[in-house]
Amino acid sequence: MAEFLQQCGSWGVLATLAAYAAGVWVNRKTGKALFNPLLMGSIFVIVFLSCFGVPYADYKASAQPVSWLLMPATVSLAIPLYEKWELLEKNLAAIFASIAAGVLTSLGSVLAMAWVLRLERAHAVSFLPKSVTTAIGMDVAETLGGTAALAGAVIILTGIVGSLLGETVCKVCRITDPLAKGLALGTSAHAIGTSKALQMGEIEGAMSGLAIAVAGIMTALLAPVAANFLP
């Protein structure tokens, strides 16, 4: 089967799209947030590769066009931000302070976990960019000596958890301001959280999209500094 797929060119793209479509179908059929389309799609791809004995490296190479689309997809999130530009100008200081606090909290939590669990450095640095989009996080992890695949898995898991629990946490903490909710989701759960923020409202989506970009830049700059404090 692996040899047959190698002759099919971009079979990985088709497999990825089919798995995601199946994940969307399962999510709509069940109506449960737990059955997140991205989570279900990932499971379907893993099962497919395992059943047919296809190496992950072959799948990754074949699905490369999907990875290339990550960056323009992330950039496109600036569109709702442009539509809410006046809101950004009015709350500029508070917005950037909030994102900075989120980034420092994310890095600090990884440092604490690394010290408590005595994680290997290669694993710990792969966790540092867990709250930024994969387009940035995987490169940051590799630059610091981590594993891109592990970083990607942790980033996706972080996004799924943030998407599932973000709105509930806001309700429990009585956070009602749409700007605050959007910044929280974008800073902690990157693009996956932003998809949830867009469902919550225009302001939430715009602020979450901004948080992805700013948090990504801050993490890329601060992660090497944080890595110096790893055990």
Predicted regions and their residues:
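Helical membrane-embedded segments and adjacent short helical loop/helix-boundary regions
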Residues: A2-T16, Y20-Y82, L87-A94, S98, ...
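Short alpha-helical transmembrane interface motifs in multi-pass membrane proteins
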Residues: Q7-C8, Y59, A93-I95, R121-A122, ...
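Entry/N-cap segments of selected transmembrane alpha helices
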Residues: W11-T16, L87-V110, G152-V161, A211-G216
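Small-residue-rich segments of transmembrane alpha-helices in multi-pass membrane proteins
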Residues: L39-C51, M71-S76, A97-V110, L128-M138, ...
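Helix-loop-helix hairpins and the membrane-proximal interhelical loops
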Residues: P80-L92, W115-V116, D139-L157, N228-F229
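Transmembrane alpha-helices that form the ion-translocation and gating core
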Residues: A97-A135, T158-C173
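Alpha-helical membrane segments and immediately flanking helix-loop junctions
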Residues: H123-L150, V154-L157, V172-V214
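Juxtamembrane boundary at the C-terminal end of a transmembrane helix
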Residues: L221-P231
